[in-house]
Amino acid sequence: MDFDSSNLSLDCLIYIFSFLDEDDLIRASEVCKFWHEAAVTPWLWRQMCLQQWTFCNVARSESGKGSWRSYFLRRARLERRMETGRSGADYTCRSLRGHTGSVVGLVYLAGSDADISSSASVVCSASTDGTVRAWDVQQGTQLWATPAQSALCDITVDTKLGTLFTSDTAGKISAWEGLSGREVASFSTSSSGCKLLAYSVENQSVLMAGTGGGALHTLTSPSLTQLSRHMLFDTFKINQLISSPDRKWLFVGAQECIDTSPKVFFSESLSCPSEDEPPLRQSLPVSDCCAAAFLPADPARLVLIHNTENRGYSTLSVFNISMKKSKYQVDILVQQVETFQLEFGGRRPDVLLQTQGSDTLVVAVGNRLRVYTLKGVVLASFEDHTQPIAALCVDSFRVVTASRDLSLRVLTWKKEKDKGRTLQSRFHLLGGSHTMSRGFTKVACDYVSIVASVQSVNGKDVLKAYSFNS
């Protein structure tokens, strides 16, 4: 007996369609007008979006006029292209040239995320040629360049204010307007090679600057007025400045000072200093720290890779950071909650550490990439490169490794019933000729693009921009 769907109500048909995947749902919408009405129901596509992705903001897509259906189809199509990585069909590669020195850092001034389909990606790069340059990633064009000054050492961005900050070898910190590249403020530290970190705490934007002499400056953003200065590592360079995702905690370390413990600060005590009391800080019970990262979904947890006293092997330790209040004072409490030994032996200053979620750790050393749980269980291991991994970029969708072998490797997260979150290696992105370059040195990503710096043989580094087609 033939089935007559006209006997079904619209609600019944929508319920039946809720068991279909996107391809079947699209085919069902083409059967007849009644089926089309059911198949394009926003509730169906909203459910599919929320099952596929943790967070969706359809109101931000397509200037706020998008539907759940168009949102799902666009995002799913883009992610399929980011998984297959076919040159020309899935992405466009452009070379960004203009620097006459080495690229020391690159940051996204404006990036595209999963909810915005039409916004342009703008990357800014700093170089030893003394300039900052802004690039349109999709068009492959330079938007502006600052006048040359002393060789630059570092760059960071306050995306909320649209302001860039750089430090140079003469000890000068500069603030640049993101739209024009105009210098809006400067501050002299009298110390070369400052490490920079911009962030907002309690609705106040600040810039942290760690100097080559071991001092930590807290400056207002973007005016660069000094709020506080503290000497932390006498004569040793501060080269680790990391803020927790909720901006409550600040990690400060000096890799060269192997016998001194890194520090963790209560951020508000630096940005809103008290005349009567020193900032709240605590030394961590480790030394010779090679890498550090907070957990995105558990911002009070800090992960450190450090060397043991006998320097025989490296250890990964996880600490919980909290406030301990008594009647007369407030202290920072640091508690070790996990620790395990890593497979590589000896001191490895080249180790890279990134985190994802509340319990996933990504560690790169040499040409090897490994994914761990907080308990030290290895979820995945890769050796896709023939030379060391120089830089690492991790987000909720993928991991990108940049290697001295002049290739990028793209890996995507995958959920498995038995293992939970794991990583799947996808494809290589090549960087050009080995005769003209010495490999990739840095990498940055937004949702629709990847930008990496190539160290050139002639000293004029080039950026490679990979823009995925939506």
Give the role of each language-model region:
Residues M1-S6, L10-S18, D23-T141, K324-E343, ...:
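Intrinsically disordered, low-complexity acidic/Ser/Thr/Pro-rich linker and tail segments
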Residues D115-S117, V123-S127, L164-D168, L207-G210, ...:
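Conserved beta-strand element within WD40/beta-propeller blades
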Residues Q387, A391-L392, R398-S470:
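C-terminal interaction modules of eukaryotic adaptor/scaffold proteins
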Residues L106, V132-D136, I173-E177, L216-T220, ...:
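WD40-repeat beta-propellers
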Residues R133-S223, L227:
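A generic tandem-repeat structural signature
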Residues C56, R77-G98, T141-D154, R182-A198, ...:
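Inter-blade linker and blade-boundary elements of WD-repeat/beta-propeller domains
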